[in-house]
C-alpha cells in the first residue's frame, strides 16, 4: 500500500482507523471476495471491484483538511469515507476497436 499523506509504502492488514487525514492506495486482492467491508453500527457495506482496476483509493480528509473544504461541513469527515476503484500505478491504453471493462460493486 502507498500512504499518500506520509509518502510511504508499507503492507497493512486488519482494521483501518480514521483519526486524521487518510489517503492510501491498496492493490486489489480479489474479484470474488469483497475488497472492503465497512461497518457502522449494525450497517455493513461490502465493496468489490474488478481486478482490471488494479487498486483502490481510500480517503478521508480528517478534521484539519475538512475544516478547509468549502463543500463539506467542518465535522463532515466523521460521516464520510471515499473508497474508489482506481488505476494508480499504470495507465490503461485502449486501442481503436478494443474495449476495457472495469466495475465497482457496492452491496448493503
Sequence positions of predicted segments:
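Short C-terminal domain-edge/linker segments immediately following a structured domain
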Residues: 27-28, 67, 79, 89
Amino acid at each position: 500500500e502507498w500512504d499518500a499523506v506520509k509518502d510511504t509504502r508499507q503492507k497493512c492488514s486488519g482494521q483501518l482507523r480514521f483519526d486524521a487525514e487518510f489517503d492510501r492506495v491498496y492493490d486489489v486482492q480479489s474479484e470474488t471476495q469483497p475488497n472492503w467491508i465497512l461497518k457502522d453500527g449494525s450497517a455493513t457495506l461490502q465493496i468489490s471491484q474488478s481486478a482490471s482496476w488494479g487498486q483502490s483509493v481510500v480517503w478521508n480528509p480528517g478534521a484539519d483538511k475538512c475544516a478547509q473544504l468549502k463543500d463539506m461541513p467542518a465535522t463532515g469527515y466523521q460521516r464520510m469515507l471515499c473508497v474508489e476503484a482506481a488505476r494508480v500505478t499504470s495507465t490503461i491504453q485502449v486501442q481503436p476497436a478494443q474495449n476495457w471493462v472495469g466495475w465497482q460493486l457496492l452491496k448493503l
